[in-house]
Amino acid sequence: MACTIQKAEALDGARLMQILWYDEEESLYPAVWLRDNCPCSDCYLDSAKARKLLAEALDVNIGIKGLTFDRKKVYITWPDEHYSEFQADWLKKRCLSKQARAKLQRELFFPECQYWGSELQLPTLDFEDVLRYDEHAYKWLSTLKKVGIVRLTGASDKPGEVSKLGKRMGFLYLTFYGHTWQVQDKIDANNVAYTTGKLSFHTDYPALHHPPGVQLLHCIKQTVTGGDSEIVDGFNVCQKLKKNNPQAFQILSSTFVDFTDIGVDYCDFSVQSKHKIIELDDKGQVVRINFNNATRDTIFDVPVERVQPFYAALKEFVDLMNSKESKFTFKMNPGDVITFDNWRLLHGRRSYEAGTEISRHLEGAYADWDVVMSRLRILRQRVENGN
């Protein structure tokens, strides 16, 4: 009954439509919005789920000429005699009330975020189950969005497993290091990850203006001593920083920092970007961390008097990351794949000893959040429909 129409009428000089639903809730719809979203074949291409009506053809002051309704539909005639029919459930879903809009945004963007520190229970699923079953793939990606990290176990100890996950999502994110890349000790390394030294907490690739959203790392070979992985929930650390030192939070969320990456791999590259280390949305919520100390440029485009306060704020942020309450340490085994949110988590690695042979080998890849979210929405629909 919630999507059943009790009454529909035009208001405000016919520039507004009001619907009273059988659950006694009311919805208001501007006439211009209704005309813009007419679902007829002249205005909407159903096969592409795309609007055909041109913006320049829309009368922004349009009113409703005629309106009738039944329990399941509203029928509107416009001043130029164009005719539109709207389904009740379609209208109810797109109600413009604050509560209805918030509900729909939650359905579209999966905003739930579970913060964690050293107490993290690392979410773990079976690699083959994720590839084979939609329910497991949905659990994988929904947990990845909520917690920020999922470990998959049971993959092989051969290269190529991250490519399989890329196909499961849609496709991988190509960077200057290739579709996939090998993390191992290399002579004349073109990235600090390709050494045996300690890697401090960082996000990957802030040197790009659009850093990859999701990272996949598959353990092919693991060293006996050292090489442990460390992760920290950057969003949780940001909350702590904002509470403990609001000025430091303000500096890191307002100062543009230069990042650079120059070298040769998939092709030759010379990359430059500018980011705030803590990136906020229009509501002041943290949406991305952009920080890699290795690729933070020596060029710093700020007035001299702001340099030292920036370093003080950054040190405070890094110290919070490295606190025992914040970081989680684990060791990957051959056949493990960790998948994590590169916009939220910062990751690092403990050093390990170099030998005459390669003692530690990971294969990595990236995915874009748009690709991941697309697959997540499709999987949810399949699981809910029992397909």
Swiss-Prot record:
Top-rank lineage group of the source organism:
Eukaryota
Modified residues annotated as Phosphoserine in this record? 351
Which cellular compartments is it found in? Cytoplasm
Which residue windows are coiled coil? none
Per UniProt, the enzyme's principal EC class comes to oxidoreductase
Q: Name one GO molecular function term.
A: gamma-butyrobetaine dioxygenase activity
**Reaction catalysed by this enzyme:** 4-(trimethylamino)butanoate + 2-oxoglutarate + O2 = carnitine + succinate + CO2
What GO biological process term is on the record, naming one? Answer: carnitine biosynthetic process
UniProt cofactor note: Binds 1 Fe(2+) ion per subunit.
Pfam families referenced in this protein's UniProt entry, alphabetically: GBBH-like_N (PF06155), TauD (PF02668)
Query: What keywords sit in the KW lines?
Result: Carnitine biosynthesis, Cytoplasm, Dioxygenase, Iron, Metal-binding, Oxidoreductase, Phosphoprotein, Zinc
**Which EC number(s) are documented for this chain?**
1.14.11.1
Instruction: Work out whether the entry's keyword set contains Lyase.
Output: no
Cofactor(s) named in the record = Fe(2+); L-ascorbate
Residues annotated to bind Fe cation: 202, 204, 347
Keyword Acetylation assigned to the entry: answer is no
GO CC field: mitochondrion
User: What pathway does the annotation place this protein in?
Assistant: Amine and polyamine biosynthesis; carnitine biosynthesis
Q: Which residues bind Zn(2+)?
A: 38, 40, 43, 82
**NCBIfam families referenced in this protein's UniProt entry, alphabetically:** carnitine_bodg
Describe the function of this protein.
Catalyzes the formation of L-carnitine from gamma-butyrobetaine.
Q: Which PANTHER family match?
A: GAMMA-BUTYROBETAINE DIOXYGENASE, GAMMA-BUTYROBETAINE HYDROXYLASE-RELATED
- What name does this protein carry? Gamma-butyrobetaine dioxygenase
Protein's organism: Pongo abelii (Sumatran orangutan)
